[in-house]
Amino acid sequence: MAGFKKKVYTSGLGTAEPYAYLSKPDYGNEERGFGNPRGVYKVDLTLSNKDPRCQAMVDEIVKTHEEAYAAAVEEFEANPPQVQRGKKPLTPYEGDMPFFDNGDGTTTFKFKCYASFQDKKTKETKHINLVVVDSKGKKIQEVPIIGGGSKLKVKYSLVPYKWNTAVGASVKLQLESVMLVELATFGGGGEDEWADEVEDGGYTASESRQSRDEQEWQEDEHEETPDDDEDF
């Protein structure tokens, strides 16, 4: 919808879990039957429950889900879907939330976004480069492999979705951009194909290469940015 503004949130400082894909997308494994041609950027971020932002994130997600689910159920009851005679419509049901309490004083949040989309007019596939900034909020031109154990903050939006035959109604934590505060290149991350082949004393890439037109990464928890209907 023209002029629509989506609300963008900022997470607390957390630790990336293994198998993060932030410098390049995860395309799955087509040969094994779970390929993803659009590609996905993703990271599971674990925060301490003592961080006030952690509970605030949980509250925001739950509130968004409850409001969206209630509206969807009301619409379902007012206008039941038409199905073939003898079949029952799929009734509303809720799915898992995109976070879980680990039982050790931490909570893990699951963020992701597609790495490409199809232009509705030209049908052309357009790729999305996830913005990653350094601890000063400046854009990193060549994003390093970000492994499990890295310290991050993320900007994200909340995208509620309805139930279907595969999953129940829930909320997607749509990844918008990432702040890399402390880099842990190795440690089992999804991109760490050379993690077991380290050679000491050799060439090491610079930790952060910044663009000339450095952009500030604001800390506003409720920053509003234009929504792009064609991203997802």
From Swiss-Prot:
Organism lineage: Viruses, Duplodnaviria, Heunggongvirae, Uroviricota, Caudoviricetes
Top-level division of the source organism's lineage: Viruses
Domain remarks: The acidic C-terminus is involved in modulating the ssDNA binding properties. It is also required for dimer formation and for interactions with the viral DNA polymerase and the helicase.
One GO-annotated biological process of the protein: DNA replication
UniProt-recorded name of the protein: Single-stranded DNA-binding protein
Chain's gene name: 2.5
Keywords: DNA damage, DNA repair, DNA replication, DNA-binding, Viral DNA replication
Entry annotated with the keyword Transmembrane: no
Assembly information from the UniProt record: Homodimer. Interacts (via C-terminus) with the viral DNA polymerase. Interacts with the viral helicase/primase. Part of the replicase complex that includes the DNA polymerase, the primase/helicase and the single-stranded DNA binding protein.
Protein family (similarity comment): Belongs to the Teseptimavirus single-stranded DNA-binding protein family.
Chain spans, region Dimerization and interaction with the viral DNA polymerase and helicase: 213-232
Function: Single-stranded DNA-binding protein that participates in viral DNA replication, formation of concatemers, recombination and repair of double-stranded breaks. Coats the lagging-strand ssDNA as the replication fork advances and stimulates the activities of viral DNA polymerase and primase/helicase. Coordinates simultaneous synthesis of leading- and lagging-strands. Together with DNA primase/helicase, promotes pairing of two homologous DNA molecules containing complementary single-stranded regions and mediates homologous DNA strand exchange. Also promotes the formation of joint molecules.
GO molecular function list: single-stranded DNA binding
SUPFAM superfamilies the record matches: Nucleic acid-binding proteins
